[in-house]
Amino acid sequence: MGKGDALTPKQIANKIKAKGLQRLRWYCQLCEKQCRDENGFKCHISSESHMRQMEVFSNKSSFIVSQYSKEFEEDFLRIMSRQFINSRVPANQVYAEYIKDRHHIHMNATEWTSLTEFVKYLGKTSKCEVEETPKGWFIRYINRDPEYVMRKVSEEKKEKAELNEEERQRLQIEKQIKELNKNKIEQDEIKPTELSKEDLEKMSLLELNIKSTTNTTTTTTNTTTTTTNKNIFDKLKTNDNNSSNNNYNDQTNPKPYAKKMSAIEEIMFKEKEKERQQKEKLEFEKQQQQQQQQQQQQQQQQQQQQQQQQQQQQQQQQQQQQLNSNNNNNEEKPWIIKDIVIKIIDKELANGKYFKQKGYIVSVENEFLAKVKLLDSGDILKIDQTFLETVIPQIGSTVIIVNGKYRGKEATIKNVNFDDFNAKLYIKDNDITITLPYESFSKQY
C-alpha cells in the first residue's frame, strides 16, 4: 500500500505515531513498553516476557503496587520542591509537568485511582498544604529541609529579640515623659498660705482708724468733717502704699521677713522630707533592680546564642563526619564483567532513547567502562558502569557473580526474596549456596 493522502485517517495516524503521542491504554506499566496500536498491544500481552512479568506480579501484587506508588509520590514531590517550592499552585498544573516525562509512572499503576485522592493523601500525611476551591484543588509544598527550618527559626528569634528591644525602649521613654510632666505640674501648683501675726495686726489697725474717724465726724462741723475725711483718706492711701511696699519687699526679699515655723510645722516638714527620701530610695532601688534584670537577660541571651552556636557547630561536625564516612563506604568498585546482561538507567543518553533498554557486555574497556550491545536494536555503546544496573532473571536461570569473593563464578538462582532484595544462589564449582543482593549478580548472556 502506498502512503495515505493528506488529511486521511492513515496519514493522521502516521503523524500521531511520528510525534510519539500514543494512547495510555496501549501502555504496559509492568514491562514499561508503549505500543502504537491495539494490534501491537495484543501481541505484547500474549508475549512470553509479559506473561513472566504477570506471574511475578501475581505473587507480589501489593508489593509492586506499593513500589510504583512510592516512585510516583517521590517524583511528584521532587517536581514540587524544585519548581513550586514557595508557591500555591493547582494540582493539575503540577501533574501536567510530571507527565511530560515519557517514562513516568502512570497513576493507574498506583494505589490512587484519581488525582483528587492523591492530593488528599498528601494533605493527610502533612507533606503539602491542600485547599479545595471552586477552581479545583490547590497545593503548597511544605519544605522540611533541616537547613531551611533552622534558618527560619533563627530569623523568627531575631525578629522577636528586635521587637522586645523596641518595646523596652518605648516603655522607658514613656516613663521618663510621665516623670517630667509630674514634676512640672508640682512646680506650677499654687499652694494656699496661712495668715501671719503681722497681717492680723495690720487688719486691727485699719479697724481702729475707721472707728476713730466715725467718732470725729459726729462732734465736729461740716468743714471739719470734710478736712478730717480728707485726712482719713490720706491715711488710708498711705497705709495702702505702705502695705503695697511691704508686699513688694516680701516678694523681692522674702528671707528677711521669713516666718519661723512652729513645732507642728517642723514635725510635718520633717515627715514630708522622710517620705520624699523614702520615695527617692525606692525609685533608686527599682532602677537598680531593672538594671540587674536587664543585665541578667542580656547574659541569658548571650548564653543561649553561645549554646546555639555550639549546637550548630556540633551538627555541622556530625554532618561532615557522616559525609566522610559515606564517601569512604560508597567508594565505587568495578563490577562489570564480559557476557552479562545489563539494563541502561541513563535518562539523558540520546535524550532518553536507550533508557531501560537491555543489552549485554561485549568487552570491558577498563575497570569502569564497558562496550555494550543492545538486544533490541543491536546498537553498540560505550558506557560507564554508573549508568548500568544488573538484570535479575527468573528462578532456575544462570547468573554470573560480579561482586565479592566469588566474582566471576557462574551460579544458579534457587530462590528470590522480594522483601529483602536478595536471592539464594547455588555455585556448582564450590558446591555451596549463598545469599547475595541484586546488585552482586546479573543474568548470563
Curated annotation (Swiss-Prot):
Identify the stretch(es) annotated as Disordered: 215-256
Q: Where is the composition biased (Low complexity)?
A: 215-229, 239-253
User: Has keyword rRNA processing?
Assistant: no
- Tell me which residue ranges form C2H2-type zinc fingers: 26-50
Q: Which InterPro entries match?
A: C2H2-Znf_KIN17 (IPR056767), DNA/RNA-bd_Kin17_WH-like_dom (IPR019447), KIN17-like (IPR037321), KIN17_WH-like_sf (IPR038254), KN17_SH3 (IPR041330), KOW_KIN17 (IPR041995), Rib_uL2_dom2 (IPR014722), Znf_C2H2_sf (IPR036236)
Q: Which GO terms describe its molecular function?
A: double-stranded DNA binding; RNA binding; zinc ion binding
Q: Which UniProt keywords apply?
A: Metal-binding, Zinc, Zinc-finger
Taxonomic superkingdom: Eukaryota
GO biological-process terms attached to the record: DNA damage response; DNA replication
UniProt cross-references to Pfam families, sorted A to Z: C2H2-zf_KIN17, KN17_SH3, SH3_KIN17_C, WH_KIN17
Can you supply one Gene Ontology CC term for this chain's record? Answer: nucleus
As for family, the record states: Belongs to the KIN17 family.
Q: What is this protein called?
A: KIN17-like protein
Q: Which species is listed as the source? A: Dictyostelium discoideum (Social amoeba)
